[in-house]
């Protein structure tokens, strides 16, 4: 909720003009629920398509490039792209896929936003609570990165937002833990 506060501020600050939000990973568990919620609040939602050159907002996995429709001013961009970390065994190739799928699209998106003639005010990018590694101590969001695979993945994923941050776009990392939902994810596996 705290990370979405800037979106609420955007909405409150401009009732006269509809705010446009781009979401990567909009078809995923979190992205689909967030899209519905934000649309209900009055935001115009745009999806970052994958490998669809006809789309207004497209990510080419071959060239690792994001194309943006600059005729639409985006107030915010929310990056939720990447396959579920809970699906499948963590083989060496799966770990590489999880890393590349997150870092590549985040880098491409942050680079495209930084180069936009009128960049968004806000870039929210998914990350993972695994950033902190394993610890029995209470941690705050100011705690440094821990050790291990998830911490390394999250650190590199967050670093990929650098081009947007350096361009002056307010950037926040959403360090998700286990997502529980009756619509998918790990909950069904636990029941």
Model-derived regions: residue spans:
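N-terminal Rossmann NAD(P)H-binding glycine-rich loop of SDR-like oxidoreductase domains
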Residues: 21-39
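Anionic-ligand binding region
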Residues: 183-191
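Short-chain dehydrogenase/reductase
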Residues: 99-103, 143-158, 180
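Conserved glycine-rich Rossmann-like NAD(P)H-binding loop of the short-chain dehydrogenase/reductase
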Residues: 43-50
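Conserved beta-loop-beta element that borders a ligand/cofactor-binding pocket
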Residues: 127, 159-182
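Conserved Rossmann-fold NAD(P)-dependent oxidoreductase catalytic core, especially the SDR/UDP-sugar
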Residues: 107-148
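NAD(P)H-binding glycine-rich loop region in Rossmannoid oxidoreductase-like domains
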Residues: 58-106
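SDR active-site strand-loop-helix element
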Residues: 24, 48, 80, 123-129, ...
């Amino acid at each position: 909720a705290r990370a979405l506060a800037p979106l609420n501020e955007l909405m409150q600050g401009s009732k006269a003009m509809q705010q446009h939000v781009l979401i990567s990973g909009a078809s995923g568990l979190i992205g689909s629920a967030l899209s519905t919620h934000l649309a209900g609040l009055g935001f115009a939602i745009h999806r970052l398509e994958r490998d669809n050159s006809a789309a207004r907002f497209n990510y080419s996995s071959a060239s690792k490039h994001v194309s943006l429709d600059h005729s639409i001013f985006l107030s915010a961009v929310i990056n939720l792209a990447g396959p579920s970390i809970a699906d499948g065994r963590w083989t060496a190739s799966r770990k590489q896929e999880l890393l590349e799928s997150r870092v590549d699209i985040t880098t491409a998106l942050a680079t495209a936003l930084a180069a936009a003639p009128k960049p968004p005010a806000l870039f929210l990018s998914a990350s993972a609570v695994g950033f902190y590694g394993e610890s029995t101590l209470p941690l705050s969001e100011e705690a440094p990165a821990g050790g291990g695979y998830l911490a390394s993945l999250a650190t590199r994923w967050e670093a990929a937002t650098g081009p947007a941050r350096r361009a002056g776009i307010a950037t926040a990392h959403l360090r998700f833990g286990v997502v529980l939902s009756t619509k998918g994810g790990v909950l069904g596996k636990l029941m």
